[in-house]
Amino acid sequence: MQISRRSKTFCTFLLALMLSPDFYLRAEPSSSQARPDDRREIALSAEERSLILGGKIVLRDLPSAGSIGRTFEAIGVLPGSLDEAFAVLTDYGSYPEYMPNVGALKIRAVAGASSIVETTLYLPLGFRKQYRLRYTSSREDSGFLLSWEKLPWPELKPSQTVTDTSGYWSVRKFEGGGNLAVYHVYTDPGPVPLGLTNFFQGLAKSSFPDGIVKLRERIRNLYRPGR
């Protein structure tokens, strides 16, 4: 079948557009698993509240209806102001300096409150995973929300990336003092080497609170060194 020059030109243009990060700044999210609700109230039990006020981190293993992946939520108090927490979390280029498992990161595009970021995770046993995320932030007087969803990265093989991941940071003023941070993540890692499924699931759950721990340390080191 003969393909006209006009058709070839259009196909080339369409492919280039789809491979451009700017295209995904306008695209719809690929996942609905961890879409945040700005109005969501975090309900804490008396025990959870006591733990959080004592500086502990509450870990929740949430149901992921109709999906293969897992959803975890860590809740804890951050030091400092909302402005400080927002500045640290939206400084994506610094993630490799403190975020667990983040080994490399490249910011591909920025448009207003949205950024396209390509991340490489360094995992135990020599495994590496890469993915492209769209981060979107929003602010109000009482707090802020930073959400992300996975975007297509056609150059990667399935074994080089995860099937899906999405999530958000919700940080709001806490009546008990400081700022209450909710770190919510859904991940479907895709195929896992035979016999290692339980290992990686256990590792993900046990290390998940480290996200808040490292964020606390980063805020203190930048704004309150020596305290």
Language-model segment annotations:
Residues Q2-F13:
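Bacterial N-terminal signal peptides that target proteins for export
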Residues G76-D83, L89, G93, V162, ...:
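Soluble non-cytosolic domains of exported or imported proteins
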